[in-house]
């Protein structure tokens, strides 16, 4: 099975790329939604997170600029997300599975997990227009260096152009 990471900074267009992939029949693991589900379904996970970050769970969004709290959170949550993704991949039955995540690149928990990487990029002004919280959360992200991406999608035109780029990526990967 080929596992492909779709990454990019917040509001770059990862979700729209993955929506196109799903529309074409590819299984896509949405790490944000899946993580929220894990918080609700794993008994005691919220308490473990609170203990790790030293704050109430309701304040989890305030840790993005606190590197030590963010790393403590990642140490608790990322292994669970990775295990959940592996189960998803094993059960999807396809030859290719996509993993959507703004933060998986460069994290040791995900090293060696993906066969290919797709970097979705968009101009800063456009990302800020799409999501005004870009500034608040950007500190928690590291964009993949261009030379480490197997494929780059430049999301600076319309939706049809984005879909066309996804289609070209599929052809380039021969999947």
Predicted regions and their residues:
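Glycine-rich phosphate-binding loop of ATP-dependent small-molecule kinases
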Residues: 1-57, 164-175
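ATP-dependent NMP and nucleoside kinases share a basic, alpha-helical "lid"
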Residues: 84-91, 96-130
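Small-molecule kinase domains that catalyze NTP-dependent phosphoryl transfer to phosphate-bearing small molecules
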Residues: 85, 93, 110-112, 131-175
């Amino acid at each position: 099975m080929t596992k492909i990471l779709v990454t990019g900074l917040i509001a770059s267009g990862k979700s729209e790329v993955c929506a196109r992939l799903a529309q074409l029949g590819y299984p896509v693991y949405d790490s944000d939604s899946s993580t929220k589900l894990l918080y609700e379904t794993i008994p005691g996970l919220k308490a473990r997170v609170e203990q790790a970050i030293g704050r109430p769970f309701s304040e989890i969004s305030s840790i993005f600029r606190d590197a030590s709290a963010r790393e403590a959170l990642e140490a608790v949550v990322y292994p669970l997300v990775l295990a959940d993704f592996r189960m998803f991949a094993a059960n999807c039955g396809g030859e290719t599975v996509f993993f959507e995540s703004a933060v998986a690149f460069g994290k040791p928990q995900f090293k060696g997990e993906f066969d290919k990487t797709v970097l979705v990029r968009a101009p800063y002004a456009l990302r800020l227009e799409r999501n005004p919280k870009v500034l608040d959360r950007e500190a928690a992200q590291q964009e993949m260096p261009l030379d480490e991406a197997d494929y780059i999608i430049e999301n600076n035109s319309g939706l049809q152009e984005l879909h066309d780029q996804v289609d070209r990526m599929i052809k380039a990967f021969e999947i």
